[in-house]
Amino acid sequence: MSDRQQVTNSRGERIAIVAGLRTPFAKQATAFHGVSALDMGKMVVNELLSRSEIDPQLIEQLVYGQVVQMPAAPNIAREIVLGTGMNVSTDAYSVTRACATSFQSAVNVAESIMTGNIEIGLAGGSDSSSVLPIGVSKKLAHALVDLNKARTFKQKFAIARRLGLKDLMPVPPAVAEYSTGLSMGQTAEQMAKTYNISRADQDALAHRSHTLATETWNSGHLRNEVMTAHIPPYKQFIDRDNNIRENSVLESYAKLRPAFDRKHGTVTAANSTPLTDGASAIILMSEGRAKALGYQPIGYIKSYAFTAIDVWQDMLMGPSYATPLALKRAGMELEDLTLIEMHEAFAAQTLANMQMFGSKKFAEEKLGRNRAIGEIDMSKFNVLGGSLAYGHPFAATGTRLITQVCNELKRRGGGTGLATACAAGGLGAAMILEVE
């Protein structure tokens, strides 16, 4: 069996990405305070349909995701269909794969096109860290169920007496890995210690990310892939990511205290992504359908891969596992790539993966390869800045990366690019994109 992945339909047509768009990304409780993931999803999908000038009735499938689930609307994809101009009969379902969620939604639509079930689909993801599902304690939840079934005042009073004051306190969503109890920041600290990632190197990468993102915004490169978002009640708007330190000074990063290991740690708020609100989406078509409708694709999916590792130690190594598999399926090596775009959840996580890309020992022991994935050429790496600067609405990051890579390759006259990300649960995602 060939190792090559055939990302085509039965007619041999490639899977085309014809358009991509996102909202500006905003830090928690700022511009999108009070705006749900669903509302941001509808916002970006409506604008993408308008800008692309596609008839919404032609969209045959919508796959959309969120990580911080909304109990009131668990199938965010279907609600987006009902809240936009698409046909109510449009197939729509929701996915979640932690920080790789919109990689998954894009692949699901691509695979539907590959099988011939559809010709046109829309994929993306949205997350809000400002509109959160606040829970209750287990004891209160148990009591509420019992109260609902109690018939007499005496029964209800007996149930209420079981509760203490602390049982009535709201419970915010967990920021920890369910299986281990470790937060993502604690995992980043693990990785910094395992791979001897210094505080200085982490701060330098964060400074680089903010500096490049500032230059990218000032150059106008993001103008066509980031919409202006008008915030209900429509008295204000946001048209630019608000996490970017536009006057980043490297020396200032050293002033912050470690956030997760106060005594010996190196991971700080400045070299980590903040909690972020935002949404993104892309339109995919078969190559033939795109040409028939007069679209010039911004890129094509050449290969993709998803991987998983154990969650107890250094679980954010996903790019180091998914990338070689995606490259193998594309028939390529790392040095063949024009651009490399890696999600920067934390500077420590990013630097650890970069280090392992160049490690023959890691390749032999963990990947079963006789050569390293390859040393990363920094002139190709996150050339527009990364998530440390732009922010990270969990489910929206994948399709941001895909759109950004395709547009930058187009500006450079074409080539191939890697988009890759780590994700909670020890997951990894990688996608090879080609642009003519």
From Swiss-Prot:
Oligomeric state and interaction partners are given as: Heterotetramer of two alpha chains (FadJ) and two beta chains (FadI).
Q: Which InterPro entries match?
A: Ac-CoA_C-AcTrfase_FadI, Thiolase, Thiolase-like, Thiolase_AS, Thiolase_C, Thiolase_CS, Thiolase_N
One cellular component GO annotation, for this chain's record? Answer: cytosol
Named in its record, the pathway it takes part in is: Lipid metabolism; fatty acid beta-oxidation
Q: What is its EC number?
A: 2.3.1.16
UniProt-annotated location(s) = Cytoplasm
User: Which residues participate directly in catalysis?
Assistant: 99, 392, 422
**Functional description taken from the UniProt entry:** Catalyzes the final step of fatty acid oxidation in which acetyl-CoA is released and the CoA ester of a fatty acid two carbons shorter is formed.
Q: Which NCBIfam families match?
A: AcCoA-C-Actrans (TIGR01930), FadI (TIGR02446), PRK08963.1 (NF006516)
Q: What is the protein named?
A: 3-ketoacyl-CoA thiolase
Q: Which family does it belong to?
A: Belongs to the thiolase-like superfamily. Thiolase family.
Which key words tag this protein in UniProt?
Acyltransferase, Cytoplasm, Fatty acid metabolism, Lipid degradation, Lipid metabolism, Transferase
Tell me where on the tree of life, at the top rank, the source sits. Bacteria
Alphabetical GO biological process terms: fatty acid beta-oxidation
Q: Which catalytic reaction applies to this protein?
A: an acyl-CoA + acetyl-CoA = a 3-oxoacyl-CoA + CoA
Query: What are the recorded GO MF terms, alphabetically?
Result: acetyl-CoA C-acyltransferase activity
The EC category is: transferase
Q: Which Pfam family name is an example for this entry? A: Thiolase_C
